[in-house]
Amino acid sequence: MFISKVFVLLFALLVGSALAAPVRIERSLGEPQLSTRGIGQMAQAAGVAIKIKKNLKPTKGKSVFWSGSRPSKNGPVSVEKDAERYAKAKGKEVLAPTLQKQGINIPAQKDSPYSYKLWKYASKVYAQRTSGSAHAVLGSTRRPGNIYDTIEKPELMKNKKVTKLTEHNAETGKKTVVK
């Protein structure tokens, strides 16, 4: 039986994460419930990771990334909707709808402790497989260690298939070509 190196690596990563997480049994689920739930979530995450590896294929010249927030009358708002509007208006695509379109469903964070890691993995694969020109809609405020600055942008910058990367300031509308 053939088991890919990526599957083994992801499985080891997920198992290691589960073992390293501190759990106070007396305040959480009983031991049998905890282990059943943990193994099920781990198996689900491994399945999603395999689907990401096999199926996530951005269309050439259509990738749009986003990160951060911008000010509004009611306080800071995420630029996610700005990126989605930009992508729709320009015939491009952001990661989440691309995943859905390709049959990949990352569980919500409340449903799986592996959700954040799966989003990071999907973001990395999306950036690595992007080709042609790419765009990023960015807020004037970004969390330290955000996925765009730590994973997506570095992958896009070293990706030889990406011919141009343009960053759009969601607050000012200013465009900056960074690659």
Locate the predicted segments by residue.
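Catalytic toxin/effector domains delivered as secreted proteins or via bacterial secretion systems
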Residues: 43-179
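Basic, amphipathic N-terminal segments that precede the first structured/catalytic domain
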Residues: 38-41
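Fungal secretory targeting signals
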Residues: 1-36
